[in-house]
Amino acid sequence: MARLENYPEAIRNHLLKLPCPTFDSTPFNRPIPMKEQRVALVSTAGLHLRGDRPFRLGDADHRLIPRDTPANRLVMSHISTNFDRTGYLQDLNVVFPLERLNDLARNGEIGSVAEYHTSFMGATEPEKMESTVVELASVMKKD
């Protein structure tokens, strides 16, 4: 994990000024055991299938990634120069642990792996993404 002190001063100051939400209470829920859960990955790494339109600055949409997608069919088009791709280039599971998720399902540690996963472009304003997220939530609930 990146440490704040490793960033240049300008970026460090910018990050320290970002607003962070505060919550007065914790929502009540009864978690379902992981062995009964169907799990999907949601990433902000700008991943997509080869042949899909690459992400651009400010894109608020997402790209669906089928469960059986081999690592060599995924491309990262994240636009940030500050986004470290080193781990991704060595092992996709660092950024998008689909193989590990399938291992967990095979070992019975989670119920199953969703048919589709998704990736967004990171650093997009949340307000721009709202309609996309509502649509995606519907797709994920059906799965």
Place the predicted regions along the sequence by residue.
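An N-terminal assembly and electron-transfer interface module characteristic of large anaerobic redox
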Residues: 1-143
